[in-house]
């Protein structure tokens, strides 16, 4: 029997799916795999920002349907693009080892510095809000499309720079385009950034995933997503969360942004990694209520 892996059809999505497929083949050489690609709603609508399109699951609806009707047995997602709530019949069953979680700055080819006359292109409110503190004299502007499309827009002169996820550039072999990395203390990543998630339908045989997932990445994912979920946020909201694991201890840093964007607080909590979800919920409550965490 051949196992069908569903993916968005962008070059990055395919590269990510192939990484998961390679991991399955290494752990289970006897398993036969095939890749099934498709366009999602978020891939088709490129003339508006994600916030303007509205709704959840812009990059997953078609993949979810493929799981339900049997066109795919598993789907691979960049975890940061997944809605915080996933359908009960379509559980997340594995999380990859985390690639570089940082955001990075990319200048046009041949440029040595930012052009103050042009905006910095970024795809999320989360990045826009944090960039204001880093580059107070620069404007930001939304940019849509896959990574290669965005880079073409940058190199054609539309933007002074782009802010992108380092993991995506590395997975595409484009690490050389990175001008500088933003430490999480400067620009807190999106929940799940750098982690790939495997989703399936209830009742599927999961034996082919044995040895594929990373337990520490799973704990980080649970904490980060619990934080965002507790604040009522989604994959397009400006809140951010990033967790690290040392031994049995998990440290979570979160960014809270009020609805009118006048209050921005950042704070951290540390606890046992088996309590990842409750840690995320507790930090969300503390920051939303203006607790003693490192609010700013």
Regions found by a protein language model. Name each.
Residues 47-74:
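Short, structured active-site "lid" loops
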Residues 68, 73-78, 160-165:
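Paired acidic/hydrophobic, glycine-rich loop segments that form the ligand-binding mouth/hinge
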Residues 83-84, 171:
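Short glycine-rich, flexible loops that bind phosphorylated cofactors or substrates
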Residues 4-6, 75, 93, 121, ...:
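Short, well-ordered beta-strand segments
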